[in-house]
Amino acid sequence: MHRFFRILGLAITDFPTFWQRLRARFSSPRALPANADTAASSAAVYQQWIIAHDRPGYSARVALDLGPLAIPARQLTTRSVTDRRPSDGDTHIILLSNHTVLHDMAVFEFAALIQRCPSIALVYGDYDHVTGMGERINPVFLPDWDPDLFWSTGYLRGAILVRADLWDQRCGMAEDTTFESLIFGLVTAVGDTPEQIAHIPHILSHLPDREWIEPRPRLDAHFQAVRTYLQTSLPGADARQIEPHGIVDVRRPSAPAPAAIAVIIPTRDGLEVLMPCVQAVRQSVSMHPLEIIIIDNASENQATLDYLAELKADDPRVTIIRDDAPFNFAGLNNRAAAATTAPLLCFLNNDTEVISADWLDRLAAEALRPEIGAVGARLLYPDGRVQHTGVILGLGGVAGHGDAGRPADDPGPLYRAVASHRPSALTAACLMMRSSIFNRLNGFDATNLAIDFNDVDLCLRLHAAGYATLLLPAVELVHKESISRGDNRDPAESARFAKEVAYMRDTWGADLDHDPAYNPNLSIALGEAYSLAESLRTEPVWKRASRS
C-alpha cells in the first residue's frame, strides 16, 4: 500500500482514516478471512478497524480467523451492528453487504477518490460473484449514480463507502435492519444533493453467487424499505412490485392542478399507421386536458387528407397544421410546439400505438418533477421485441439502442429493460417534457440535425442545463419505426446522415465517449451493447500508479 502512495506522490497522511464496518452473518464465515487479509494489508495505513456483527457474544477475531500477524489487537474492535454509537471522530466507513469480500485494492481506490473529492458522501463500485469453488463469475458493471434505478432495484451492493457524518445522521439501526434498508436510509439522507454520490467503475468487491442465482430476497427487502419510506415521507405516492422480477414501480402523486398536454404528431400520408396512432391518443383517459396537434408534412394521398379534415371537424381537441417544406423532423416538431400554450409537450411519432391506458398521467407525473427534463416510454416492435429502453451514447459511433431486439420479458442487465432509470438520451418517438424547458433550449436543432440525432442532441442540452432524462417502462407503446419516412439508402440521404454524424461528433464528442449511464468497461461496438469492451475506456487508479 505504501508503494502506491509513493508512486502517486502522496504521503500517507494525505489520506483519510477509514473505519471498516463488516456486516457478516457468522453462520457462514467462509468468505471472511479474505476480508481479514485486505484489512491486514492496509493495517499500517488505516489504524483502526471495527468489525460490526449481528451475533451477540460471538468473537469477531475467531470468526475472521485473524492470526497474530494480521491486525494487532489494539487496532481491532468488535461491535454489534445495531450499535447506536456515532463514528467516534473517524472520517469514513466501509459497509459490506452480507458475505461480501473486498477486492485487495478496494480501500486504496476509495481513498484515492476521497483524496480528490473529499466532500463526496457515499461511494460505490462494481462487483462480481464468487462460486463455492472460488471462481469469479458474472461481473456487474454499474452506471454512475442513478436515483431512479436505485429506487426501482436497490442496485447498490458489495462495498459502499460512507462519510462518517452521514453515518452519524442515521446512527443506530433496528434489530431487524437489513442491508437494503440501511443503504436506502443513507441514500435518502443525502436527499437533494445526488452529486455527493460517486461511482468507481471498477470491481471493488466479490459477492456470493447465490445473490446472482436468487436475487428476489434482496429485491423484496428493498421494496419494504421503499414502501416504509413512502408511507412516512411522501404521502400520495404508491409503490408496487412488478412480477415476475420483483422490481419496484413507484407511482408519484399527481400534480395538484392538472396541466394541459399537447400531443404533437408529425405525419406524411401513412394513413395505415396514423389512424391507430391518433385513435389511441383520442381514447386516452387522463386527468390532464388534452390537445392533439397533427403537423402534416405535404401529404398527397386523398384518403389521408380526408381523414385529417374529418378529425378536425369531429374533435375540437385536434389541430391540423399544414407544412409543405422538405421533410425536417426537428423543424416540424418545433413549429407544432410553437402553436400551443400547453405546459406539457408530448412528441409522438405517427407510427406508434399506445398500449398503456394511463400513459399520459404517468408521463406527466414524472415530467413535472423539478429535476426531470424529459421522460420517455418503453417502445416495442410489432412482434413484441424491445425497440427502445433508452439510448446509449457512443454506441456505434454516436448513439444507439442497447436493448433493441431483446425479448419483451427479458429484464436485461440491472433490470434496465423493465425498470425506471435515467439513460443519457431518449428517442423522440415518444417524449414528454415541459414546454418552458423546451422553449428555453430553443427546441430541436432544425439547422444541423434535421432528421437524425436531434433527440439525442436535445437530451444532451438538457443535461448541460442541469436536467435529467428518465425512461419510464411502465408506459409502453408499439413502434413501427420509420414506416412513413423510409430509410437512408439513397446517396443524398446517406450524405445527409454522414453530415449529421459529423456534427454530433464535433459538438458532443467527449460526451458521446463517456456515457455516465453506461459503464466504461462495456462495449460501444454496434450490436455488442452490455458485453465486455475489447478496449477498456477506464483503468483503476492502482493500475495506472503501478506503471509510473
Regions found by a protein language model. Name each.
Residues 2-72, 218-258, 383-384, 395-422, ...:
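C-terminal, non-catalytic tails of nucleotide-sugar-dependent glycosyltransferases
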Residues 66-72, 113-116, 279-289:
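Short, acidic, metal-binding catalytic loop of nucleotide-sugar glycosyltransferases
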Residues 80-88, 323-340:
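Glycine-rich, basic loop-to-helix element that forms the pyrophosphate-binding segment
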Residues 93, 345:
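Short aromatic/hydrophobic "clamp" motif used to bind/position activated sugar donors
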Residues 104-137, 192-195, 352-398:
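Conserved donor NDP-sugar-binding/catalytic core segment of glycosyltransferases
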Residues 136-166, 330-331, 338, 394-436:
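A recurrent flexible, glycine/aromatic-enriched loop bordering the glycosyltransferase active site
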Residues 166, 175-196, 200, 226, ...:
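A short, conserved alpha-helix in the catalytic core of glycosyltransferases
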Residues 282-325:
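Acidic donor-binding segment of Leloir-type glycosyltransferases
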